[in-house]
């Protein structure tokens, strides 16, 4: 059935979009729960434990973002091949992204396990002995989970590329149930503290990885990868994947390196500031869930539209997705502003000073996010889905070093600013990114990109 909006059959009618988006929103909520559960349960050990976990998680996020970027490259190539009605090439791309992610994650895990102390000292410098002790314990077990995270990200991205977001949602549900149950037993039952939280996360990620890989090799899977032979390196396909994956990986990597630089700056403000920053980061992540989910859906929707040669539909669905992202941002942030911020902060075992810092940050986050978060982070996924990853990389790197890093160091070291000034630098970064991505989208040059 043709729609009056298009000259051809719509690729994603309302029911298909809802079926794609709702599981992604649920998956994002479940994913964020792992970080919240760890921080909440570890907070019972004290601020030093929260700080140690927070510092390591900032590095973990760097690794996870790079692996997610590589998975994004595979998802874009696979989505465009699906839209172009080339199932054989789509399956081949699926196998290659598993090869790329498994190789990368094992290599990174080996480096971190061998050099975790030097990495922590190099990034964060001189921190309290208790914080360092907790951080080293958490870092070791986190590194062991990297291969599971990499393969899980690859498998989940491939299911989303097919338009099947229920699989990644269900595997995320399993991961969270195991993680929270493990936290309860190991932290409260056996008194293992930070080590218990890290072990629970490791086991939960391994199980989620096993579930996704099992489903990916089942006969009914459209992107079935049923043997190690299928994962033999294919230079041509790897180059196509990396054409999106490398710029996205550099972008995400540099973005997280910038955040690590700022975390290093935050660590000079004292344990209360580190703890407040950790809690604010964890709680505000919940507010981005709808817009993040829309960004993930955009890789599938826009990728398949452009693979099918339907530029008109790509533009239409992009606008529709952005409207959805903004609606989600307004609902979440206004709800937090009026009802949830103070309650969320009270859940953590923070000093009065740290609580006050966290509340100030969260209020400003609510206000700024209403206007620029979706265009800063959801919109670039639309451009990446077209293969326009170099532009998003360039804008993100320039903006991050100029505002998120440059402004923050200037504000703190030269003008004596505190934790709030660091977050203000981040908001300036969002505004600049939003403007650049909006202009790129409006001019339409992203529609001329292709990765197949």
Please tell me what each predicted stretch does.
Residues 71, 141-160, 168-176, 197-212, ...:
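Short runs within selected transmembrane alpha-helices of multi-pass transporters and secretion channels
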Residues 14-33, 37, 59-66, 144, ...:
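Residue-level signal for short hydrophobic patches within transmembrane helices
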Residues 19-35, 141, 175, 204-208, ...:
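Transmembrane helical elements of multi-pass membrane transporters/channels
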Residues 62-65, 179-183, 209-213, 286-289, ...:
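Hydrophobic transmembrane alpha-helices of multi-pass small-molecule transporters
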Residues 50-110, 149-168, 274-340, 373-396:
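Small-residue-rich hydrophobic transmembrane alpha-helices
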Residues 47-58, 135, 139, 198, ...:
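Small-residue hotspots at the loop-to-helix junctions and early N-terminal turns
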Residues 29-51, 120-129, 185-192, 253-286, ...:
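Helix-terminus/linker motif at the lipid-water interface of multi-pass membrane proteins
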Residues 1-24, 78-145, 189-246, 302-369, ...:
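Short alpha-helical transmembrane segments in multi-pass integral membrane proteins
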């Amino acid at each position: 059935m043709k729609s009056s909006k298009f000259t051809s059959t719509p690729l994603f009618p309302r029911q298909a979009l809802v079926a794609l988006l709702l599981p992604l929103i649920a998956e994002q909520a479940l994913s964020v729960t792992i970080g919240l559960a760890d921080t909440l349960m570890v907070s019972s050990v004290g601020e030093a434990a929260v700080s140690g976990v927070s510092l390591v998680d900032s590095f973990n996020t760097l690794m996870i973002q790079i692996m997610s970027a590589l998975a994004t490259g595979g998802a874009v190539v696979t989505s465009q091949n699906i839209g172009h009605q080339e199932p054989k090439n789509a399956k081949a791309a699926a196998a290659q992204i598993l090869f790329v992610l498994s190789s990368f994650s094992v290599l990174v895990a080996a480096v971190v396990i061998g050099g975790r102390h030097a990495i922590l000292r190099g990034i964060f410098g001189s921190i309290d002995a208790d914080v360092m002790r907790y951080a080293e314990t958490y870092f070791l077990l986190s590194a062991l989970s990297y291969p599971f995270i990499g393969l899980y990200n690859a498998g989940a991205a491939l299911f989303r590329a097919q338009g099947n977001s229920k699989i990644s949602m269900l595997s995320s549900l399993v991961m969270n149930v195991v993680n929270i149950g493990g936290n309860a037993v190991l932290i409260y039952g056996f008194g293992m503290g930070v080590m218990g939280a890290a072990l629970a996360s490791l086991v939960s990620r391994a199980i989620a990885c096993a579930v996704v890989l099992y489903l990916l090799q089942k006969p009914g899977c459209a992107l079935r990868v049923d043997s190690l032979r299928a994962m033999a390196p294919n230079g041509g396909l790897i180059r196509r994947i990396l054409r999106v994956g490398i710029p996205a990986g550099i972008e995400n990597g540099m973005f997280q390196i910038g955040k690590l630089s700022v975390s290093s700056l935050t660590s000079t403000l004292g344990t209360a500031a580190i703890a407040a920053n950790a809690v604010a980061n964890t709680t505000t992540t919940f507010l981005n869930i709808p817009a993040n989910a829309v960004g993930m859906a955009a890789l599938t929707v826009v990728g398949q539209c452009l693979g099918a040669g339907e530029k008109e539909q790509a533009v239409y669905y992009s606008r529709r997705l952005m409207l959805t992202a903004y609606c989600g941002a307004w609902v979440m942030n206004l709800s937090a502003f009026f009802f949830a911020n103070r309650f969320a902060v009270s859940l953590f075992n923070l000093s009065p000073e740290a609580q006050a810092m966290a509340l100030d940050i969260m209020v400003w986050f609510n206000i700024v996010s209403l206007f620029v978060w979706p265009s800063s982070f959801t919109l670039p996924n639309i451009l990446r889905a077209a293969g326009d990853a170099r532009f998003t990389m360039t804008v993100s790197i320039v903006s991050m070093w100029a505002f998120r890093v440059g402004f923050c160091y200037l504000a703190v070291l030269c003008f004596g600013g505190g934790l709030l000034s660091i977050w203000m630098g981040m908001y300036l970064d969002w505004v600049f990114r939003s403007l650049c991505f909006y202009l790129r989208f409006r001019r339409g040059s992203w529609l001329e990109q292709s990765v197949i």
